[in-house]
């Protein structure tokens, strides 16, 4: 008989279900199976002892080899016993079992059959060794189950199961436990309790709690028997596709074991919940669902930082352990930069603001293995991180901003943009054109933007594209002059600017009836062509928003409509918008207060436009009047800094407002910046353009009332783009000394007089400009909702913490302070803001002049400033661009020059 292997997983003598129960019974002293049966002697190899290990009713032959000193070690036997438990009965193993087991040798000749094994020399060839759990094992020992954490790359959004916050980043966002499958931040790895509940990978029983250096059995020494191979077919690394592949497959555990023992002895009390505002996407730690909203999304325990919904709070167990610290470091999830509200706060706003953030504030792409290595000592045990190197301040301090990060404030439909068009219809079809009378057969595929003629139904190669925006008309058969003699006529015609497509083939005298499948694959027949005509006609229709009322009839989109041309003030009746513009339903540019904005294209010129579609039946009369107010205001505004309204179409059910299409908005520019905020020189460039557009509005007694980065559009993707104001749904006609009281705008950017339902005037826009400057330079909102704005303004440390305001000039802070004035009479006007030293910058003036030269229109700067800046450049030794020199400017201080300058200055301040 050959010698047994060094260690082999046991082959249970009972079925699997009974074996697990037997293992649990085996770990109690005196529960052995009784006298050992006769064991056949096994021939031992040189330098080894062959014997059997018995755990419950499972018995395994093992081989004990000599160590490097030539002796036998009892530690080897303990190691074998723990390995068998980990492989065969992982649900029965626990951390530190190595120190909690006793070994007994069966001696049939003795009155006491079980003899305690005190040394490896007590084990003889062919003995049966019983593994028994010591009475020193406590209930807490069974509860301590450390996690096996590995760096993981997630392909879908995931949340930390300790703090509830989202795992940020593109790759290696966090750690995943291979035992229970839970996910954690790298920063939370040192705080999570050792409570792994999984059995995917349990190889921790052979670790000593006393620090004894144990010998781990290498994977090369393990051999599995044939019946057990199906259990071990999939390695732990194969169970998690996103796990980082490591050569040594080293795992990491959570907080120190002795701390878990201390915490288990503590008295558990009910949680103390307070309403909380979260700055990052967070899930409820009870139901694992997202805490929705922008502010006051849920409740958080003041002591242990447990997060949950308000509806889930009564169901949360009373298991709060309070604030747990070790070496001054808080082990409960940190407050980070969140804002704690009072208990009495209104929780209904979370339902009104249930839009999820569209933009992420950071992307963590770090090597977690290096971070873990820094926190390990030589023995491989986890050490507490250096508090000086913590990446997040856990308490509110003047050094770090505690304000809400800048985000897109959603008030209506969530901003979405689908990248790929959905196929509306596909199939074989034949056609010929006005330039080529040869009838061709292709596989047609219709989506929301074009008709693509593919070579076949499986490949990606195509013959031609027919953009829907280029289709001028879709009509039945009009002419048969191009039909060859004896050929069947076509079914319908697609007319574009350059060519006419004659589609389909109407078989007049079919030779024999064809089965349906051959008709579909051949692309001929009046029925097949009719289906294509209806599908294309439907694709050319204006977009019908979800939830809108839909009438009956195939020509619903050709209801009597009125087209109002803003440029020439012409009104045309019975004009269908689909004959002039093509609307792309899958290109959602955004949403305003009264409708969704889609991308579109002018059919004849190919010019890109933005089309706002409003379903009138969804809105009450008051909101419909606000829409008309927006159109009426835009009709009277013609300024390069204001978005251009081309025309408006109106049907009994819907209104289509056609505007120029721009590149993006200012908020997208801020959030996509490297630091999540803009440099000062770019902010000056953008703010100056906003102020010039506001000056034009205020000159016409128009107050925007909803000024925010989302409503500042960029004309291009250039680093220094032209900007235009849009979304005048809340705009009001307010005289110089007039006041209004109706509630308008977005709360995050509104002045306090509006929030308090007091009268407001045109200075309302100037408060919004101050907020825009603040969020552009810092990437956060300036105020918290739970504190009085006046008190926050007085607290300079709160308003301007060193991070990031230490990098920002004092002139910028001074301008913000003069704009964010609670008293309206102290708030800066447009011209006073433009004259502030922060905006009177030579480089900003040069950038604006370059923009004006590029556009071909001077509307931001004034000629009266040319001489002043040219003189400034000479005094400072700066090079003045030659192409910006104004030839009409005179360098002599003649009375005529002074009179001209005074006249120009009078024009500039005439609106004050």
Swiss-Prot record:
ZnF start-end (Phorbol-ester/DAG-type): 146-196, 270-320
Keywords: Angiogenesis, Apoptosis, ATP-binding, Cell membrane, Cytoplasm, Differentiation, Disease variant, Ectodermal dysplasia, Golgi apparatus, Immunity, Inflammatory response, Innate immunity, Kinase, Magnesium, Membrane, Metal-binding, Neurogenesis, Nucleotide-binding, Phosphoprotein, Repeat, Serine/threonine-protein kinase, Transferase, Zinc, Zinc-finger
Disulfide bonds: none
Record annotation: effect of changing residue 152 to Y: In a colorectal cancer sample; somatic mutation
Region (Disordered): 377-402
UniProt-recorded Gene Ontology molecular function terms: ATP binding; diacylglycerol-dependent serine/threonine kinase activity; heat shock protein binding; identical protein binding; kinase activity; phosphatidylinositol 3-kinase activator activity; protein kinase C binding; protein serine kinase activity
Gene3D superfamilies reported in the protein's UniProt record: 3.30.60.20, Pleckstrin-homology domain (PH domain)/Phosphotyrosine-binding domain (PTB), Transferase(Phosphotransferase) domain 1
Domain Protein kinase: 583-839
Domain PH intervals: 422-541
Outcome when changing residue 502 to F: Decreased phosphorylation level when coexpressed with SRC in HeLa cells. Unchanged phosphorylation level when coexpressed with ABL. Unaltered kinase activity. Decreased kinase activity
Matching SMART domains: C1, PH, S_TKc
GO cellular component: autophagosome membrane; cell cortex; cell-cell junction; cytosol; Golgi apparatus; nucleus; perinuclear region of cytoplasm; plasma membrane
Known outcome of mutating residue 677 to M: In a lung bronchoalveolar carcinoma sample; somatic mutation
Keyword Ion transport: no
Enzyme class: transferase
Function description: Serine/threonine-protein kinase that converts transient diacylglycerol (DAG) signals into prolonged physiological effects downstream of PKC, and is involved in the regulation of MAPK8/JNK1 and Ras signaling, Golgi membrane integrity and trafficking, cell survival through NF-kappa-B activation, cell migration, cell differentiation by mediating HDAC7 nuclear export, cell proliferation via MAPK1/3 (ERK1/2) signaling, and plays a role in cardiac hypertrophy, VEGFA-induced angiogenesis, genotoxic-induced apoptosis and flagellin-stimulated inflammatory response.
Membership in a protein family: Belongs to the protein kinase superfamily. CAMK Ser/Thr protein kinase family. PKD subfamily.
Name of the molecule in the record: Serine/threonine-protein kinase D1
Record gene name: PRKD1
